[in-house]
Amino acid sequence: MSYRKLGRTSSQRKALLRDLTTDLIVNGRITTTEARAKEVRKTADKMITLAKHGDLASRRKAAAFVRNVVADVKEDGDDIRVQSALQNLFEELAPKYADRNGGYTRILKTMPRRGDGAPMVILELVD
């Protein structure tokens, strides 16, 4: 199994992929370098596939990878409902992609980064 090292140690690389995958789940799109986006695409597809399974084991595997961050806050009068990234993954993204077999993300190339000329892309979830 091949992967990109991204110029980091294994723990730093895993933390980077966890952060970027969580940001993609929460926001729906992220701007990053092309190499990072290609790696995040793999992990994001795996997380959405786990969410589509929907069982307890899949939820625990996804919870071990996705960061525990607030995805959305909704107010209904006196009630405040806080939705985490994991809830967003299982309650919104899994039903959205129920009929799709993979390919949940899209990479759009943008201008190179000013400063070092790194190829930048927008990684977004397909509608």
UniProtKB/Swiss-Prot annotation:
GO molecular function per UniProt: structural constituent of ribosome
Keywords: Ribonucleoprotein, Ribosomal protein
GO CC, any one term: cytosolic large ribosomal subunit
Any GO BP: translation
Cross-referenced Gene3D superfamilies: Ribosomal protein L17 (3.90.1030.10)
SUBUNIT field: Part of the 50S ribosomal subunit. Contacts protein L32.
Protein family according to the UniProt entry: Belongs to the bacterial ribosomal protein bL17 family.
Protein name according to UniProt: Large ribosomal subunit protein bL17
